[in-house]
Amino acid sequence: MKIYGIYMDRPLSQEENERFMSFISPEKREKCRRFYHKEDAHRTLLGDVLVRSVISRQYQLDKSDIRFSTQEYGKPCIPDLPDAHFNISHSGRWVICAFDSQPIGIDIEKTKPISLEIAKRFFSKTEYSDLLAKDKDEQTDYFYHLWSMKESFIKQEGKGLSLPLDSFSVRLHQDGQVSIELPDSHSPCYIKTYEVDPGYKMAVCAAHPDFPEDITMVSYEELL
């Protein structure tokens, strides 16, 4: 398993944008052009090119030759490389991607003030109770820990919104370990959280517990 991250410390230059756009599919180029906010376009573009960059090095392929598709519930995949599993997430200034030989999910969230009503509506009873038990000044952080962990699990499953958020429970313990409460019939999975930046929460979900200790940072220049 490998996890890569791009920190968008500056906007893409026109030259970088044009070069990256040349790597991606016509459909993705059109999607990027339709974004109202340039930052949204850049996040989407960088996520696509990051995957292409990693896959091209691993399999000796040209970036522009990699063909993406989607699975039944919309999870991106590479049909020609069925063992190359990946997942992308972006929020704020971060674009991150996880790679593994088995299905994997990743999520990053920029924290902001929350309403506990959202937690009551979407979280399991156990998770909501855990959240309420936190001190007031810890509740926002724990909310985003829960949200990113749950999103990473849903993305690892690859079933999208067909899997209700309250159908399973996650808990982040004081020692940093994560426990998951799943139906007995469900195959084992594991979650690890990462502290990449103050004001962000990130989690990865995989079919095995062999997580890297850190993420590998990638610069714009390394993608060219």
Swiss-Prot record:
Cofactor: Mg(2+)
Keywords: Antibiotic biosynthesis, Magnesium, Metal-binding, Transferase
Entries under SUPFAM superfamilies matching the protein: 4'-phosphopantetheinyl transferase
GO biological process entries: antibiotic biosynthetic process; fatty acid biosynthetic process; lysine biosynthetic process via aminoadipic acid; positive regulation of single-species biofilm formation
Residue ranges of the region described as Peptidyl carrier protein binding: 158-189
Chain residues that bind Mg(2+): 107, 109, 151
Effect of residue 107 to A: Loss of activity
Pfam families assigned to the protein according to its UniProt record, in alphabetical order: AASDHPPT_N, ACPS
InterPro entries: 4-PPantetheinyl_Trfase_dom, 4-PPantetheinyl_Trfase_dom_sf, AASDHPPT_N, P-Pant_transferase_sf, Ppantetheine-prot_Trfase_dom
Resulting phenotype, residue 97 to G: In strain: oKB105
UniProt GO MF annotations: holo-[acyl-carrier-protein] synthase activity; magnesium ion binding
Recorded family membership: Belongs to the P-Pant transferase superfamily. Gsp/Sfp/HetI/AcpT family.
Role, per record: Activates the seven peptidyl carrier protein (PCP) domains of the first three subunits (SrfAA, SrfAB and SrfAC) of surfactin synthetase by transferring the 4'-phosphopantetheinyl moiety of coenzyme A (CoA) to a serine residue. Required for cells of B.subtilis to become producers of the lipopeptide antibiotics surfactin and plipastatin B1.
Name the record gives this protein: 4'-phosphopantetheinyl transferase Sfp
Gene it is expressed from: sfp
